[in-house]
């Protein structure tokens, strides 16, 4: 049995190495809303000087980072299909500057817009799309609403956490309880992480769907019925406000798509190829 497991590990490693051989990655720093953002630019192998290709901006979720498996698999598969990507850490996350306690959805939206401007300046950048998981999905949807279809050619949302506004109104975020009408300056979460009171104050009246509905381009929403963090009905509502969208409800899939990750990556990349290539 151990030999079988070892063979599986070796095969998985070889697959990752082969993916890496088909793409080029470069770590960069982008000026964000409260400091520098750590980012990775990944381009398809064989992209020649002067040639353009589509670029997808990949946004992680609350307490996540750009190096998550979902983000990595998506970027790798995009590169295999001739599409570049830029994945980055929001302020207060991963390797990016700024305290986690200073992070809010509005300043993550500002981060996303600054990353968009960076991507637009890349010499190889063609059409630009956005994808985001959880809170990153909310940020992607609102950023696309602000920038419009002329600038964002398609959007993919994975378990978009639009519940965050209702959580703030109820006074409960990620299991932490507080007075929503008078939140403390810091709310303890996990380990040493503390959520800032400004996060709650801004989330309380955040116009998530109102801003997102301004986006008129093609969109894809993927959500699981087993999501215990964000009920899939929040994903369904995006489908209702976006006429040019498709909705994939995955039976029993959890918030992180732990058992459905490859299926989610395949759906995501197939949709992006269809709308960008």
Regions found by a protein language model. Give the residues of each.
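The alpha/beta-hydrolase serine catalytic core
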Residues: 34-37, 138, 145, 150-237, ...
């Amino acid at each position: 049995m151990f030999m079988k497991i070892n063979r599986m590990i070796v095969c998985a490693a070889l697959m990752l190495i082969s993916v890496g051989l088909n793409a080029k990655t470069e770590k960069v720093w982008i000026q964000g809303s409260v400091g520098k953002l750590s980012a990775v630019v990944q381009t398809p192998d064989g992209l020649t000087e002067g040639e353009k290709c589509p670029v997808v901006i990949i946004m992680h979720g609350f307490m996540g980072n750009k190096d998550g498996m979902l983000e990595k698999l998506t970027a790798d598969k995009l590169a295999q299909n001739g599409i570049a990507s830029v994945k980055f850490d929001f302020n207060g996350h991963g390797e990016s500057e700024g305290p986690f306690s200073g992070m809010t959805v509005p300043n993550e939206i500002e981060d996303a817009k600054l990353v968009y401007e960076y991507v637009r300046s890349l010499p190889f950048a063609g059409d630009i799309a956005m994808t985001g998981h959880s809170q990153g999905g909310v940020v992607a949807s609102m950023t696309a609403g602000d920038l419009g279809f002329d600038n964002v050619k398609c959007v993919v949302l994975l378990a978009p956490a639009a519940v965050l506004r209702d959580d703030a109104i109820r006074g409960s975020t990620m299991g932490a309880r507080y007075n929503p009408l008078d939140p403390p300056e810091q709310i303890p979460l996990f380990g040493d992480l503390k959520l800032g009171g400004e996060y709650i104050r801004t989330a309380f009246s955040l116009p998530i769907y109102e801003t997102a509905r301004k986006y008129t381009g093609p969109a894809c929403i993927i959500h699981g019925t087993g999501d215990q963090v964000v009920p899939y009905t929040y994903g369904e509502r995006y489908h209702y406000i976006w006429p040019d969208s498709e909705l994939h409800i995955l039976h029993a899939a959890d918030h992180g798509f732990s058992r459905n990750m490859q299926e989610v990556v395949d759906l995501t990349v197939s949709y992006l190829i269809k709308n960008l290539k």
